[in-house]
């Protein structure tokens, strides 16, 4: 997947350069994306979307905000895929994972996830948002990070139950 990420993150219209430094940077990008996916997956392992999901209108404002940000990500990524701008796909997904998710959202909800009761509405609100995001994020990364997407898919019982593979 790291090699695929390097290829995708390079604008194919210009010369492709390979070096140890570039592969270290790409490995770091990969690690951040993968860790974000694994964090999302780990925080929904006790969540059944059919019985535990909170209605979107009743989500906490922070959870509504991240879903709006995610909707923007989806729109941008699909446009970049359609124009074969894979380097922009990688940039957009990486920036979302690092800035909106890792830099803001996941940092804020950690207390909510770890200190509130398992079935509390505020915890389920975050889990609803995370479930909605991971279900689509795994599809967005699959063309580039196919092995990672498949790993996440196989470890999400809900996704695996609906379809055998990403």
Predicted regions and their residues:
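Helix-rich, typically C-terminal accessory recognition domains appended to large enzymatic cores
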Residues: 2-166
């Amino acid at each position: 997947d790291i090699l695929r990420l390097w290829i995708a993150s390079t604008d194919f219209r210009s010369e492709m350069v390979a070096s140890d430094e570039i592969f270290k940077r790409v490995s770091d990008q990969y690690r951040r994306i993968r860790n974000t996916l694994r964090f999302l997956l780990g925080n929904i392992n006790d969540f059944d979307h059919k019985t535990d999901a909170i209605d979107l209108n009743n989500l906490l404002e922070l959870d509504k905000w991240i879903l709006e940000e995610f909707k923007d990500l989806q729109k941008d990524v699909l446009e970049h895929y359609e124009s074969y701008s894979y380097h922009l796909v990688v940039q957009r997904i990486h920036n979302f994972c690092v800035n909106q998710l890792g830099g803001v959202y996941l940092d804020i909800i950690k207390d909510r996830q770890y200190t509130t009761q398992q079935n509390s509405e505020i915890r389920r609100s975050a889990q609803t948002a995370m479930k909605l995001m991971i279900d689509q994020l795994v599809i967005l990364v699959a063309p580039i990070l196919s092995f990672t997407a498949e790993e996440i898919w196989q470890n999400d019982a809900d996704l695996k139950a609906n379809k055998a593979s990403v």
